[in-house]
Amino acid sequence: MFNIKMTISVLLIALIVLLIIILVVFLYYKKQQPPKKVCKVDKDCGSGEHCVRGSCSSLSCLDAVKTDKRNIKIDSNISSCEFTPNFYRFMDTAADEQQEFGKTRHSIKITPSPSESHSPQEVCERYCSWGTDDCTGWEYDGNEKEGTCYIYNNPHHPVLKYGKNHVIALPRNHKHA
């Protein structure tokens, strides 16, 4: 009788130890995540993912901006943005001209010719893309026919505010992030 109780006790202890080992191993492997895929452009990532700071991510555009642009300040009225190949684009958004980032903008008047196939916004974006690495953003204020393009070259962290009919874009994965 004593041997049976002893055998049952040993089996219960062994079962408990085995369950604890399985639980620890399960929790350890659950915490382990596959390494993030390294990327340079969105095409390097899977469907629904974007390249954010050199890693593929499924973050929303607004969360990606906050990850990529450390210490950025965004007005609570701004609830979304969109990914473009080189920029995070915000509609109805402007830089706060009272802050360091907004104080040093340079204006460029854009009035495309009728034969030009690009919109003024596209011209503004290309100006920033083709410029030097010092372009830290562009802003367009106007309509589809004409407006003013502002180029930013200040590495200070942007402060964005609501601005009707303004479009602002910040470079993705930029050296001044």
Curated annotation (Swiss-Prot):
Regions that span the bilayer? 8-28
* Keyword Protease annotated: no
This protein's GO CC annotations: host cell plasma membrane; membrane; virion membrane
Q: What induces it?
A: Expressed in the late phase of the viral replicative cycle.
Coiled-coil annotated spans: none
Keyword line: Early protein, Host cell membrane, Host membrane, Membrane, Transmembrane, Transmembrane helix, Virion
Virion surface side, ranges: 29-177
Intravirion topology: which positions? 1-7
Top-level taxon of the source organism: Viruses
Q: What's its membrane topology?
A: Single-pass membrane protein
The record's subcellular location field reads:
Virion membrane; Host cell membrane
By sequence similarity, the record places it as follows:
Belongs to the asfivirus inner membrane protein p22 family.
The protein here is known as Inner membrane protein p22
